[in-house]
């Protein structure tokens, strides 16, 4: 009689824009080279928009309504049940979802990363570990400026305007309050090696139980 295959581990990693979520996620993935690991970015699940480019520029991308959370929950559940998904693709330069999808197979460890992954109880219930990356506001702003200017083709003035208009207020209204749901709060992001090691130890213990 064969034993039932264990469900993949889902780790939720959240924090404000520029907090170091991706760095933490990559640090986790590097520690588990002997296991299959995948990143499931919440950004891929921004809703499709029919408006003009100018209208899409004005969208509040830090509000929960900007995301197709139902689709994210559906596909995260499928991965948890060992089913492949067709993940949407989001293009930051056009501020919209593309017509493309990416075929994704379930892996041993699924890192679900995004600014609002802890905001919905249905999504939290799928997670084995919930992590909040806590970084100073000024540092996050500087990181966001560097990233958006270099890789997303945005201007300095545009970044500052968006930060003051939506990013900062939405962080305090929606993102920071989800800290209370975290199993682990990681100050200083990926630079906090002690927190990363503690997280890796916990993940490894769950994997060992699943073997």
Curated annotation (Swiss-Prot):
GO terms for cellular component: cytoplasm. GO terms for molecular function: ATP binding; cytidine kinase activity; uridine kinase activity. Pathway: Pyrimidine metabolism; CTP biosynthesis via salvage pathway; CTP from cytidine: step 1/3; Pyrimidine metabolism; UMP biosynthesis via salvage pathway; UMP from uridine: step 1/1. It comes from the Bacteria. Keywords: ATP-binding, Cytoplasm, Kinase, Nucleotide-binding, Transferase. The gene is udk. It holds the Pfam family PRK. Its EC number is 2.7.1.48. This is Uridine kinase. It comes from Latilactobacillus sakei subsp. sakei (strain 23K).
